[in-house]
Amino acid sequence: MLKYLIVLLDDTSTPYCHYENPKTEYKLISLQDLRAAILLAMKENLMVQFVYPDYKLPQKYEEIIETTEHCKIMPVACCAGADIIIGDYWENPEGRKMDRDKIYVLRTKKEDFFSHYEKVGEMLIHVARLNIILTDVDTFTEADFDKYKSVLAELAFQLKDFCNEETIPQFNLLTDRMLLDSMNNCNAGWENITLAPNGKFYVCPAFYLSSDGYSIGDLENGLDIRNSQLYRMSHAPLCRHCDAYQCKRCIWLNRKMTLEVNTPSHEQCVTAHLERNASRDLLQEIP
């Protein structure tokens, strides 16, 4: 059942997951389509997530956006009023202060993560939640798995001291699994869909931005999701018996790596299980 509508406000809207955005030419969604998207969300009782580009929107757009309950996903370069802030670098050359009340998403390549993971503890002090997204998880090798396991163990050691405080930090790679008792995945195509600036619906932003992506309907004619059952957990034979509940189970990566939207790649499965194991070890260390 649909719960969320993700609206890309511009062709250059910030990527916030595993995918990249190769588009460089600004192209705003039309005001007509923006209004229609909000009306649809109201009718279907959907929470709207607006994904912003790296520039300030015209005032008229902001006025329309404020007519509905929503969440703002913004790049760190232009994040005034953001609920979720997206970054893609570990350094903070401009001296921006992190907001203790905001959620931060750090998109990073594996080598950068392996080199800078010691900064995670420092970041957790200053944010409400930190999500780290490995943008090249599909390239993991056996050596990378070993390194990832080691890094997660080091991070768990860092977090153990934090967990002795009154508030346990929220960090997707380690603390999510501790709090879950069922799958909590991306669920694109089932619990959320994306509206692109061209007025068409897509499973997620990656399907709009990829050269081999496909639409699943439009505002005028409604949704047309072929084999929609394949996006549901009930039709994911491997995942529905898994207990790595924090796994993103990225639908786009599934299709990219296995050609099946309901079948994750080896790389996704192994990294998710390493996170689950590290989370278990951390939980056992907490007094």
What annotation goes with each model-predicted range?
Residues 32-143:
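Radical SAM/AdoMet-radical enzyme domain recognition
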Residues 21-23, 134-138, 175:
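Short, histidine-centered active-site or binding-site loop motifs used for metal coordination
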Residues 13-16, 76-80, 87, 106-108, ...:
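Active-site pocket-lining/capping segments in soluble small-molecule metabolic enzymes
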Residues 1-36, 40-44, 249:
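Canonical Radical SAM [4Fe-4S] cluster-binding loop centered on the CxxxCxxC motif
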Residues 6, 25-31, 196, 258-259, ...:
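Extracellular/mature segments of secreted proteins
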Residues 208-287:
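Flexible mid-to-C-terminal extensions adjoining Fe-S/redox cofactors in radical SAM and related proteins
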Residues 6-18, 56-57, 133, 170, ...:
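Class I S-adenosyl-L-methionine
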Residues 129, 138-211:
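A C-terminal junction/extension of Radical SAM enzymes
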